[in-house]
Structure formats: structure tokens, C-alpha cells
């Protein structure tokens, strides 16, 4: 066999066995034992939910009333209650000031805060009233 044929055979062998080895490595050898999790669609989750109150559309949390729904990302969002008992979730204001950060991280003080220069729930309330 000529040298070029050996090169082709060697490259082909490396490709076949190399890809199998890489696949086994990245799948940790469990490529045939993969488990497929069946995730329910959003519609199925809503329709099959046993909630007997109000089902929050963003979090699928069951609460007594719509105004009791939590924000989907409470660590980074403030829940601002509007005058008509509706609410809107906004991003917490970004600040390096520890005093303001403590206020906005507080679940009671944060939604009631109205600090000049920050787009917080006070700002949302003013914007809603002037709407």
C-alpha cells in the first residue's frame, strides 16, 4: 500500500474512532442511557393545574386574588401595586449605594420606596397617575 493510501486509512480511522471517543467523553459514556424528560407545555400546565383560586400567568402560582401574584424574578424585581389593585413588576434600580440597595432588597420597604432619581415604584406610581 502506498504512503498516501495509509494516510487516508489512518485519517479515516482517527475520524471514526476519535469521534466515538470524543462523544463518549462528553456524554460521560452514557450516550445510550439518555433520559428524555417530557416537559408539559405551558397550556397543559395551566389546564391541568389544581388551583381553585387565581392562577398567576407568569409564575403559575395559585393565589387568592390577582394582586397577590408574585413577580417572576423577585431577587431582581420590585412589585409595584397600582391604584386599581393591578400591579407591574419592574427591575430593581441599579445602584452601588448600600443604603438604597438595602431598601430595594427589603420586601416591605422596596415596593413603597420613592427616591428621587430612581425608577422605582414611586416613579411608576407617578407615571401611572399622570397617564
UniProtKB/Swiss-Prot annotation:
Residues 1-24 form the signal peptide. InterPro entries: LCL2. GO terms for cellular component: fungal-type vacuole. Disruption phenotype: Leads to long chronological lifespan. Transmembrane segments: none annotated. Keywords: Signal. It comes from the Eukaryota. One of its GO terms (biological process) is ERAD pathway. CDD domains: LCL2-like. Belongs to the LCL2 family. Present with 1990 molecules/cell in log phase SD medium. Probable component of the endoplasmic reticulum-associated degradation (ERAD) pathway that acts upstream of HRD3 and USA1. This is Long chronological lifespan protein 2. The gene is LCL2.
